[in-house]
A protein has these predicted regions:
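Short beta-strand segments
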Residues: 8, 97-98, 127
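Short glycine-enriched loop/turn motifs at secondary-structure junctions
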Residues: 15, 64, 130-134
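Short, high-confidence coil segments that cap the C-terminus of an alpha-helix
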Residues: 43, 91, 118-122
C-alpha cells in the first residue's frame, strides 16, 4: 500500500516564528524533515501543507525549489487543512508529519503504513499513550 505523506509546516509559530527555515546542522529544519521522510519506501508522494497566509510565501518558494509539492490552506485550522489537502490529493488515507520533527524515523513510518493497510483502522499512531520521544510521532489517518 502506498500513501502520501503530508508534512504540516508554517512560518507563524507563536513560540519560534520562522522555525521551518531556521538552520539545524547547516540546513533548514523543513529540509531535514523532507529528507527523512523521503527515505520511506511506501509513499506515493510528499506534500507540504502550509497556510495561505502571506507570511508563508517564503516557505512555499523554498519548498518548491526542492521540487516538493505544496498545498495551501487555512492558517489556524489544521484539521481543515488536512482534510482539504487529502481531498486535493484524492486520497482517504495519509501519513501526517509535523514539520518540526527532524528526528522522524523512516522505518517506524514504514511499519505504521503497513499497519494502515487494515481497512478496519482509521488511525495508526504511536502517541496514545506517548512511548516514543517527542518529534518521532507516527500518524496514519483515514
Amino acid at each position: 500500500m502506498k500513501v502520501p505523506a503530508i508534512i504540516f509546516s508554517r512560518m507563524g509559530s507563536s513560540r519560534l516564528p520562522g522555525k521551518a527555515l531556521r538552520h539545524i546542522a547547516g540546513e533548514p529544519l523543513i529540509k531535514r524533515v523532507i529528507n527523512r521522510v523521503s527515505k520511506v519506501k511506501n509513499l506515493s508522494t510528499i506534500v507540504v501543507a502550509t497556510s495561505n497566509s502571506k507570511a508563508d510565501d517564503r516557505l512555499v518558494r523554498y519548498i518548491q525549489s526542492l521540487n516538493i509539492d505544496v498545498f495551501r490552506g487555512a492558517a489556524h485550522d489544521v484539521l481543515n487543512r488536512a482534510v482539504s489537502c487529502a481531498s486535493y490529493l484524492g486520497v482517504e488515507k495519509f501519513v501526517r508529519i509535523n514539520g518540526d520533527s527532524p528526528f522522524i524515523d523512516p522505518e517506524l513510518l514504514e511499519k505504521g503504513i503497513e499497519l494502515g493497510g487494515d481497512p478496519n483502522l482509521d488511525l495508526i499512531s504511536n502517541v496514545f499513550p506517548r512511548t516514543y520521544p517527542v518529534g518521532t510521532s507516527v500518524e496514519i489517518i483515514k
